[in-house]
A protein has these predicted regions:
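Structural micro-motif
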Residues: 49-58
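Local sequence-structure signature of Cys/Sec-based thiol-disulfide redox active-site neighborhoods
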Residues: 1-30
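Short alpha-helical
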Residues: 15, 41, 72
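Non-catalytic, surface beta->alpha helical segment in thiol-disulfide oxidoreductase systems
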Residues: 61-84
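Thiol-based oxidoreductase modules, predominantly thioredoxin-like and allied folds used
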Residues: 31-42
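ATP/adenylate-binding site constellation spanning eukaryotic-like Ser/Thr protein kinases
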Residues: 11, 51, 70
Length: 84
């Protein structure tokens, strides 16, 4: 089974988002970053998917992780068997 596509909804100056991007990049994960601060349509998409108005939000296929730190991110990836 292929790994789910990872999409990170973030904002440019969000420290939690920067940490998540660094964490994923340093471990070799492939992911798409969507800046909801610059793209209103993407913000509405994130809000519709997650019922959240704050970032970060990580979408991995049908699974979502919201308002997280890197420890929670690592746990989420492991629990769902998502590898780089």
């Amino acid at each position: 089974m292929a790994a789910p596509e990872l999409t990170l909804y973030s904002r440019e100056m969000c420290s939690w988002c920067i940490d998540a991007k660094d964490f994923l990049s340093e471990r070799g994960y492939r992911f798409t970053v969507v800046d909801v601060g610059r793209n209103r349509e993407a913000y509405e998409e994130m809000k519709s998917l997650s019922s959240q108005t704050s970032v970060p939000v990580l979408a991995a296929g049908d699974e979502l992780l919201v308002n997280f730190d890197t420890d929670q991110l690592e746990k989420f990836l492991n629990e769902h068997g998502i590898k780089p």
